[in-house]
């Protein structure tokens, strides 16, 4: 279980989050909905160690986590809104780059793990493909596989249905629900309330500041 207590974050004069509290039960989907400016994406970025946390407390399974070491903790694997796949790298190369550089995996170890994830997500035939040749749904799954390469405790999705047509939106919904059946803990931030209601065990609404 993940518990956030009185988390605060400010960018310059703008208060993004103020004494924010959140409880994320293990193996469940927590959806956070609300308009832009409510701090949803910033929250995910902080949990992934991509932004600093000004103040507050993070407790995971009873352990107080240092706020300045979340990136090394691999607490959250981040699936970016725009996927952020490297266009000059193949699917396989996108997946193995970070584990080799940051986790001291050998190329053989990383490639084996990546192929296992691609098979699980139905992408094994696209291992040598480049991002430009993939559909939106396929890119989403590659981004998920990349997030899973670091063995995170939690997967976080930033606006996973943004700019997707209804068919691909349903595909993403099924993928997230399948991951719950596999025991994954997931946080989804979105402005798409019907989508959030379809997937969430816990639904939290935030307002813009």
Locations of regions flagged by a protein language model:
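Helix-to-loop junction immediately C-terminal to a conserved catalytic motif
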Residues: 48
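Conserved ABC transporter NBD signature motif
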Residues: 56-64
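ABC ATPase NBD coupling module
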Residues: 64-77, 181
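Conserved ABC ATPase "signature" region
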Residues: 107-125
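Conserved ABC ATPase signature
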Residues: 130-134, 138
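A short, proline-enriched helix->beta-strand linker immediately N-terminal to the Walker B motif
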Residues: 149-153
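Catalytic Walker B motif of ABC-type/P-loop ATPase nucleotide-binding domains
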Residues: 155-158
């Amino acid at each position: 279980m993940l518990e956030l207590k009185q988390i605060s974050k400010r960018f310059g004069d703008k208060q993004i989050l103020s004494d924010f509290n959140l409880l994320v039960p293990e193996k469940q989907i927590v959806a956070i909905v609300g308009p832009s400016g409510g701090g949803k994406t910033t929250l995910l970025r902080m949990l992934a160690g991509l932004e600093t946390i000004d103040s507050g407390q993070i407790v995971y399974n009873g352990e107080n986590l240092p706020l300045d070491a979340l990136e090394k903790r691999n607490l959250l694997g981040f699936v970016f809104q725009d996927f952020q796949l490297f266009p000059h790298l193949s699917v396989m190369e996108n997946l193995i780059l970070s584990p080799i550089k940051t986790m001291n995996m050998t190329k053989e170890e990383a490639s084996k793990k990546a192929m296992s994830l691609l098979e699980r997500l139905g992408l094994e035939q696209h291992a040598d493909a480049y991002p430009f040749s993939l559909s939106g749904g396929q890119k989403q799954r590659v981004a998920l596989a990349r997030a899973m390469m670091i063995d995170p405790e939690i997967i976080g999705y930033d606006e996973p249905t943004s700019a997707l047509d209804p068919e691909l939106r349903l595909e993403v919904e099924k993928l997230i629900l399948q991951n719950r059946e596999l025991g994954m803990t997931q946080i989804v931030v979105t402005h798409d309330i019907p989508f959030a209601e379809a997937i969430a065990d816990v639904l939290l609404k935030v307002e813009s500041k």
